[in-house]
């Protein structure tokens, strides 16, 4: 973090409970954190150099100054006004938080999209899990449209980054031919990605800058030698409004 010297850092799967976060864990960064209600799971956070002008999340969240330890008294209530119906069951899971930066007209969102399962007709649980993911995708597409349009009206750029649990294109997955029927690379998931990207709405920044590059991958299976062989998936993205992307 010190070497990169980033203005904003997005974290997903911040699985610890607020009480377990060491004091001063993020140094001189301001922390906006939606831990979620599921112990040991999910959680998203944004780290910024300066205090954000506004912080929004669907569920309970914390806003901490540098070196400040989280306490229950700091918990802020989330806002689900206007949230698509499909997203309401996810509101308290620690999957989305966004900040308005105070020193530049930019809204940054951090996302941890639910993981589904490869549907198996003989296993109802896999079908239900994938249906749940697809419901999130339906609602989140509408949410993205709304937030992007609101930011445009306010004269703000918009960026959503995080773990989408989907490889969009063949270049985003090393063994794409063998995974065409697997969750994370299913046709309906990839088609959903097509619907949220366009030159006039949101742009996949990495792919725009590196159109002919495989990857860069951001996740590797712990099985076998996937990491050693760089047999990975690109499931983490920065999607930016056109002016910001350029």
Protein language model features and the residues they cover:
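Active-site surface patch of divalent metal-dependent phosphodiester/phosphate bond hydrolases
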Residues: 1-80
């Amino acid at each position: 973090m010190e070497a990169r010297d980033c203005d904003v850092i997005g974290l997903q799967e911040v699985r610890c409970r607020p009480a377990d976060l060491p004091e001063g864990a993020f140094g001189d960064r301001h922390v906006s954190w939606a831990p979620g209600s599921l112990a040991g799971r999910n959680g998203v956070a944004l780290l910024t150099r300066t205090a954000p002008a506004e912080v929004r999340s669907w569920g309970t969240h914390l806003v901490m100054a540098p070196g400040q330890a989280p306490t229950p008294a700091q918990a802020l209530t989330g806002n689900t006004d206007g949230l698509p119906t499909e997203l309401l069951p996810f509101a308290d899971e620690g999957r989305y938080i966004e900040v308005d930066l105070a020193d530049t007209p930019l809204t940054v969102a951090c996302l941890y999209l639910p993981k589904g399962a490869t549907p198996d007709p003989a296993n109802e649980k896999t079908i239900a899990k994938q249906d749940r993911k697809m419901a999130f995708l339906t609602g989140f597409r509408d949410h993205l449209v709304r937030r992007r349009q609101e930011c445009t009206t306010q004269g703000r750029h918009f960026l959503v980054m995080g773990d989408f649990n989907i490889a969009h294109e063949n270049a985003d997955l090393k063994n794409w031919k063998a995974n065409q029927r697997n969750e994370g690379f299913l046709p309906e998931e990839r088609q959903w990605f097509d619907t949220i990207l366009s030159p006039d709405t949101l742009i996949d920044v990495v792919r725009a800058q590196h159109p002919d590059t495989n990857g860069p991958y951001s996740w590797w299976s712990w099985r076998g030698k996937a990491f050693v062989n760089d047999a990975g998936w690109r499931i983490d993205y920065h999607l930016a409004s056109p002016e910001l992307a350029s």
